[in-house]
């Protein structure tokens, strides 16, 4: 059994609607172990750095504005096939076509305010986890 780690973010719209506990409960119900977690309010520089790969895309400015609009909760999740399983559980970016039972189907407002983020590959998970957490802050079981 090979455990993977992935980064999850509970985004500003979900934090503002008091959905943190609900989302965390659903993650644990799906077998994810939370091995690191913190709440923070990104500034513009932090948001631009995290989403640097999208800098030249049309939605970049709106994304940065949204991600700095209120606090977020960042988590490191661990389980077998964590990246793929969390991507599936999140649902598609557009909540109008997200599958019933996914986090975005349940909680997302629109494509920008889609409540959660998840790493899209193991390599990106490692980079994204390191962006928010020092090794000493992660309690792998």
UniProtKB/Swiss-Prot annotation:
Its EC number is 2.7.4.6. It comes from Histophilus somni (strain 2336) (Haemophilus somnus). Keywords: ATP-binding, Cytoplasm, Kinase, Magnesium, Metal-binding, Nucleotide metabolism, Nucleotide-binding, Phosphoprotein, Transferase. InterPro entries: NDK-like_dom, NDK-like_dom_sf, Nucleoside_diP_kinase, Nucleoside_diP_kinase_AS. The gene is ndk. GO terms for cellular component: cytoplasm. This is Nucleoside diphosphate kinase. GO terms for molecular function: ATP binding; metal ion binding; nucleoside diphosphate kinase activity. GO terms for biological process: CTP biosynthetic process; GTP biosynthetic process; UTP biosynthetic process. Its cofactor is Mg(2+). The active site is at 117 (pros-phosphohistidine intermediate). Belongs to the NDK family. It is found in: Cytoplasm. Major role in the synthesis of nucleoside triphosphates other than ATP. The ATP gamma phosphate is transferred to the NDP beta phosphate via a ping-pong mechanism, using a phosphorylated active-site intermediate.
């Amino acid at each position: 059994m090979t455990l993977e780690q992935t980064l999850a973010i509970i985004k500003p719209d979900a934090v503002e609607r008091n959905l943190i506990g609900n989302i965390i409960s659903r993650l644990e119900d799906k077998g994810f172990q939370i091995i690191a977690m913190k709440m923070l309010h990104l500034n513009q520089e932090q948001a631009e750095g995290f989403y640097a790969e999208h800098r030249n895309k049309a939605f970049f400015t709106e994304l940065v504005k949204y991600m700095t609009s209120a606090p977020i909760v960042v988590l490191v999740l661990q389980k077998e096939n964590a990246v793929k399983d969390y991507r599936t559980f999140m649902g598609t970016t557009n909540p109008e076509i997200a599958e019933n039972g996914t986090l975005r189907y349940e909680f997302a407002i629109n494509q920008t305010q889609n409540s959660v983020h998840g790493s899209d590959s193991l390599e990106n998970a490692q980079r994204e986890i390191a962006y928010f957490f020092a090794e000493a802050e992660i309690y792998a079981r």
